[in-house]
Each structure stands twice: as structure tokens, then as C-alpha cells.
Amino acid sequence: MQTEEKPFKIGLALGGGAMRGLAHIGAMQVMEEHGIMPDVVAGTSIGAFVGGVYACGMSLKMMERFCYSIYEKDLMDVVRPRQGLIGGARIERMLRTLTGNRTFDQARIPFAAVATELERGERFVFQEGPIWEGVRASISIPGIFVPFHTGGHTYVDGGVVDRVPIAAARELGADFVIGVDVGYRGGESPCDDLFKIILHSMEIMEWQVMQRRVGEGDFVLAPSLLEINPASMAQAETCIRIGREEMQRRLPELQEAIEKKKAELAARQE
């Protein structure tokens, strides 16, 4: 008796890295140009932002244009620093607009946003309710953004526990997961203002956790972004270009890995 062949699903796990995460856009553009379309997407921090907006239907070209038109001041509503430097009201309005107020079950493709539940210190995967809420929770860098409060819980940046959400992509049903790591991976990084100090402290912690998980993805892209200021939109074009170039360079390796995984799964089903 012949069993019905299960569709092969590609998952995309977009990691955190503040503004360096704009490299996700370039990497995804190359994938799309070569017919490698994700069936599911999971994101952490800036990866949740890019992945959430993409899952709601915004084209990568439109996303790129948006990045060139926005400045840090458009995202910042500075508050008295009791829980964070930035209140988050401006970015919440922007997220509602960019996602069209869609809920997770209204997304064009299955999407999950990874955050950290602060009270219990645990990874939390948003898959229900408004997408903007999951993204807002996931991007809440401790000390910079006021934490996101919903359902009686407090959430901060998902990178605290899971910088590149490979496991979340698998939980969405992916057979093959492409991880994109845009965070710090060693080396000297300038820390000459408060934002950079907080961000780099987070990056160091995330890197220590990430090193133990680097082998979880079927393919992990890690563009070199150390020279990019993670607290500024000024290098958006450079960041996107680096993402494109690195994915283009490793494209044959990715294509080969996908075909190999397909063959392995087909052999198991025989």
C-alpha cells in the first residue's frame, strides 16, 4: 500500500541582532529570487519584526524601501527610565499598521514570535492573538524598551533565551530549517554610548547561549556584521547588501542541503 507523500516544508528562523537584522531582508530576497520560499517563519527580536511583517504579506522590496524611509527618532518615545528608556507606543502604532492588525491565524504563512516571559525566565512562543503583540514582546530589549505586558505576564526580548528560533520553526512543522544569525559572534565592538552598552551586553549573553545551539539548524547563515552599528538605521542599505551577498555566496551549499534532506525524508517514507 502506497502512503501519501508528505509535503516538504522549509522553515526560516530569523534571529535577533537589533538593526543588524535588516540583513534578513537581503538574505530572503536571494532565497526568493531562486525559488526557495519558506513555508513557515519564526522570529526573535528584529527577526520577529521582519518575519511578522513578511508573514502578513509585505513584499521584501517594500520592506527594503520602508527601512530606507524611517529613522530611529520615528521609533522612540523616550520615557522616565523606570522600566526602560523607550515606552514603545510609537513602535506599537507602527506594528499595527505594518501587520494590518492581523492575528496569527490570519497570516499568509504560519508565523511564530519568540519572547522571554520575565517572571518565570522561560521562552514563550507567541502563536495566537494579534501579530503585533508577539512582535512587540519579542523586540523588548531589556533596559531599552519598556517590557510588554499582556495576559497578566511580562515579556522581554526573545534573544535572552533563544537568539535564533530554530526550535520554534520546527514546532511549526518545518522539515528543513534555515537559521539566519545576525548577532554578535566574538570580536571587538565599540561601546561608546548607553544604547550600545546595553545592546552589546545583551549580545554577549546571547552569544554564550547560542554557541551551544549552533548545530540545531539544517543550514545556518551568519553574515559578518560586526562593523554595523546595531543602534542605528543609517547603515540599512549596507546591512541589506551584506545579507544578500552572504546568501548568494552560500546559495549552492543551501540548495545542496535542501536536496539532501529531501532525499533523506523520501528514503524514510519508502
List each language-model region with its residue ranges.
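Patatin-like phospholipase
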Residues: 1-44, 52-270
